[in-house]
């Protein structure tokens, strides 16, 4: 111990050390409260290495992690939302859009890309929950239809990662219409016998769960994802009964047959590639499953900062 450490108390030294740590280097798990190294968490696809809690992931990060590196090409980026109804609740809709676009650096709540998955051509859509709760707008519907049309043109499968609170109320019937519009587009994909895999992440609710999210040839979910139409509290107040433990979580839905499979995020890429290879009569991907995340993955030189 140095002479300065003998003079100063431990709390003063700890506070000084913390003050020198750049913001965003560390984060805390929403489930277990473990302090995690931000860069390591990103490498682990936002899955806590201690309790395996699947945190929310941005649409663009998910797409880049899922598709083969260098194969990605964005679709529908020119489509932008408009406040046709001049809607206003506690805030103008155009102001909500501007705030969401600034916060997420996205134009709307769905990002679509075409690319390759283990060398297989595929079109992938992913919801951005941070953009007004991933709500389904007319642009979201248009981009999803664009994804279907690209899959039809390329004669390839479609994968969609859902994370949404439902229809966007600020667009009224134009938003609700997207439920029918996206469902009709998927019917065209089914007629061509092209696979559609829907991946339900936390949360997938409302009009999205009642349309495109549950229409997959395979409906896959991440662990402990909240999936349903109305929230548990609303249902309890309506039926005036206590709901079962874990109601509307992916494990409960799998047990009741509402979904087909639960897949951990680090294993998602290979598992879906394997399923798509079977559905399209292609050779199975040969890469091994990603290694399990290590709970001691924090670099040694940062251990004293936890």
Swiss-Prot record:
Domain CoA carboxyltransferase N-terminal, residue spans: 25-294
Start-end of C4-type zinc fingers: 29-51
Residues making up the signal peptide according to the UniProt record: none
Domain of life: Bacteria
Key word Lipid metabolism present: yes
UniProt keyword annotations, A-Z: ATP-binding, Cytoplasm, Fatty acid biosynthesis, Fatty acid metabolism, Lipid biosynthesis, Lipid metabolism, Metal-binding, Nucleotide-binding, Transferase, Zinc, Zinc-finger
Record note on cofactor: Binds 1 zinc ion per subunit.
EC number of this enzyme: 2.1.3.15
Claim: ATP-binding is one of the keywords in the record: yes
Protein's name in the database: Acetyl-coenzyme A carboxylase carboxyl transferase subunit beta
The organism of origin for this protein: Sodalis glossinidius (strain morsitans)
Gene from which the chain derives: accD
